[in-house]
């Protein structure tokens, strides 16, 4: 799903019975740099929580065309493609820590963006 910012409301309006039929979901989430905005954060959190009820995020690939923002010391891709797999199809193999993945390719040939470590590392260490 790549619908330029409308993904959040689309997910929220989708009945759970339909969402759980998807074994694999790939969504490009836009406007992630707005996560510090309370209203947007609540919308995004509700959308992610709905997906994560029955799916697990197995990969995140930043869109380098959109760039990255640094807010309060946190690097946030402005748009990123998330891949989810339904939990009944997934065996937890532990976190991936090698990025970019060999199958990742930049959207454009300049200004590469690698997933910032804070998105996959254990910050409680």
Regions found by a protein language model. Name each.
Residues 1-45:
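Active-site segment flanking the S-adenosylmethionine/decSAM binding pocket
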Residues 31-125:
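Rossmann-like AdoMet/SAM-dependent catalytic core
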């Amino acid at each position: 799903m790549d619908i330029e910012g409308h993904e959040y409301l689309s997910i929220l309006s989708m009945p759970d019975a339909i969402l759980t039929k998807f074994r694999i979901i790939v969504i490009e989430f836009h406007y992630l740099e707005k996560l510090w905005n309370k209203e947007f954060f609540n919308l995004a959190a509700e959308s992610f929580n709905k997906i994560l009820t029955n799916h697990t995020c197995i990969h995140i690939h930043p869109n380098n065309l959109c760039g990255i923002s640094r807010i309060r010391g946190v690097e946030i891709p402005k748009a990123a493609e998330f891949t989810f797999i339904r939990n009944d199809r997934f065996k937890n193999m532990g976190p991936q820590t090698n990025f970019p993945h060999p199958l990742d390719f930049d959207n454009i040939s300049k200004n590469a963006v690698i997933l910032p470590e804070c998105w996959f590392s254990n910050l409680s260490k």
